[in-house]
């Protein structure tokens, strides 16, 4: 838990103000690691609990998380939420990564990232599935899409005119 809270404070923020494109630009600034550097950082994290080493491992793989999350865009869920879930998976991977086994972190982390995103999708879908017909599911996702389109303009505060706008679509 200490690693997650410490690293989370230093990660780029995926917010509604800057949006996804601003976040993607931010994460491009983090350098990729070569195999030797990755091994040394992972060893330093595992042996000494060096949080800075873990942070470098995480930040150098944020692009991988974004790429994997983009592959799940067709599920009708917010990409930024899938990226956030993927980042949690990446942190789990860094926490459990054993560099001595000879694999690169990206290979190992990919499974954790995908698992976190898929778990999020299943949680989201199961909320919809319980007692809903196909028409209700479609309505639910259309409402969610409309809400996401309107949210940036309203800053989350839905006034009567916004409710009317949604109702008329």
Identify the meaning behind each predicted range.
Residues 4-130, 134-153, 165-168:
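Alpha-helical promoter-recognition and RNA polymerase-docking modules of transcription initiation factors
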Residues 1:
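Acyl-donor-binding surface of acyltransferase catalytic domains
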């Amino acid at each position: 838990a200490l690693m997650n809270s410490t690293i989370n404070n230093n990660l780029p923020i995926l917010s509604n103000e800057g949006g996804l494109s601003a976040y993607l630009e931010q994460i491009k600034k983090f350098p990729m690691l070569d195999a030797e550097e990755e091994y040394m950082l992972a060893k330093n994290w595992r042996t000494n609990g060096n949080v800075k080493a873990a942070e470098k491992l995480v930040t150098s793989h944020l692009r991988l998380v974004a790429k994997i999350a983009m592959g799940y865009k067709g599920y009708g869920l917010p990409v930024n939420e899938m990226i956030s879930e993927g980042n949690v998976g990446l942190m789990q991977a860094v926490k459990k990564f054993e560099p001595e086994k000879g694999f690169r972190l990206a290979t190992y982390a990919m499974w954790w990232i995908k698992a976190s995103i898929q778990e999020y999708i299943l949680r989201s879908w199961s909320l919809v599935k319980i007692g809903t017909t196909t028409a209700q599911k479609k309505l639910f996702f259309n409402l969610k899409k409309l809400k996401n389109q309107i949210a940036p303009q309203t800053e989350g505060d839905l006034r009567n005119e916004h409710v009317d706008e949604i109702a008329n679509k």
